[in-house]
């Protein structure tokens, strides 16, 4: 019997909506990354994007454990000498709550063109409203 390999044109992708309110950042991000890769499907193939679309709502209500609200620091660099910037979790969640979840999930995906395609299927919104109701996303609980 031959080994099954998923073809990109035959992969069926579903839409799911995840409520991040009260969820722990790392635990939620690992589940989302696994779903984006398609590892929950029997037809998972490492070199084919078999994952689903994930819509995350209420990103502003995500929580972290311990003292990470003040101690967790996000870095960015402009590319120029001395151009490093840092912001802690507390300030970033107030400024751009979507970036917290996006950064956590992106770090758990492959660092190659396939990983970038997987990342594009992640949609994160700060509030409870999202523009993807036409896709009829199913609710996903972790």
UniProtKB/Swiss-Prot annotation:
Q: State its role.
A: This protein is one of the early assembly proteins of the 50S ribosomal subunit, although it is not seen to bind rRNA by itself. It is important during the early stages of 50S assembly.
GO molecular function list: mRNA binding; structural constituent of ribosome
Cross-referenced Gene3D superfamilies: Ribosomal protein L13
Oligomeric and partner information: Part of the 50S ribosomal subunit.
Cellular-component GO terms for this entry = cytosolic large ribosomal subunit
Concerning SUPFAM superfamilies, the annotation shows: Ribosomal protein L13
GO BP annotations, alphabetical order: negative regulation of translation; translation
Q: Which InterPro entries match?
A: Ribosomal_uL13 (IPR005822), Ribosomal_uL13_bac-type (IPR005823), Ribosomal_uL13_CS (IPR023563), Ribosomal_uL13_sf (IPR036899)
Species in which this protein is naturally found: Pseudomonas syringae pv. tomato (strain ATCC BAA-871 / DC3000)
Coiled-coil annotated residue ranges, if any: none
* Protein name, entry field: Large ribosomal subunit protein uL13
């Amino acid at each position: 019997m031959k080994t099954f390999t998923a073809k990109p044109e035959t992969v069926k992708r579903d839409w799911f909506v995840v409520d991040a309110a009260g969820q722990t950042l790392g635990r939620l991000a690992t589940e989302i990354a696994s779903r984006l890769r398609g590892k929950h499907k029997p037809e998972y193939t490492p070199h084919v994007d078999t994952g689903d679309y994930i819509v995350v709502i209420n990103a502003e209500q995500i929580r972290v454990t311990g003292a990470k609200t003040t101690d967790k620091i996000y870095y960015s660099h402009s590319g120029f000498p001395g151009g490093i910037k840092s912001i802690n979790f507390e300030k970033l969640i107030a400024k751009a709550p979507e970036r917290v979840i996006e950064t956590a999930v992106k770090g758990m995906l492959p660092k190659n063109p396939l990983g970038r395609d997987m990342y594009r299927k992640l949609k994160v919104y700060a509030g409870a409203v999202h523009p993807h109701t036409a896709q009829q996303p199913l609710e996903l609980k972790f």
